[in-house]
Amino acid sequence: MSLVIKGQFGLIVDAVREKRPVIHHLTNYVTAGDCANITLCAGASPVMADEAEEVAEITSNADALVLNLGTIAKAKMQAMEIAAVAAKNKGIAVVLDPVGVMASKLRLVFALKLLNEGLVTIVRGNYAECLALLEEKAEGKGVDSNGNVTDGLRAVSYTH
């Protein structure tokens, strides 16, 4: 890592620790603890609310929203959509982790709906997930990609 990048990274870390942003995660139960701990280590404050009745209120008090499709269910999809609308109304970033969209039509249709409605700011996906979101043939095994990150970034960059 170059000294310039290290310096910029240090400034970003300092800014996050100074602000202590609240990050609302609607994530999967497999990684919820890891996501909360990483958020804390970065100097931010995690909240892991996924009940549809409270997500708009929680999101309206957050500084960013993370949506992870890892363990998707209809109730969670409803909560994610409500939270994403609240985030858009507040003007905060929404990060979508489209886990397994190449393996499940339910996940793909839902992720595309969020994207097409302008409810996502950043997509954090692997090669196969990015190709699936571009409605291209995506090869993967389960939720894992057979491609590489560089190819995925190249594919996404061509659409912008």
Task: Annotate each PLM feature.
Residues 159-160:
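Conserved small/polar residues in nucleotide/adenosyl-binding loops
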Residues 2-96:
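Conserved N-terminal subdomain of the carbohydrate kinase-like
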Residues 64-156:
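Conserved beta-alpha-beta core of the PfkB/ribokinase-like small-molecule kinase fold
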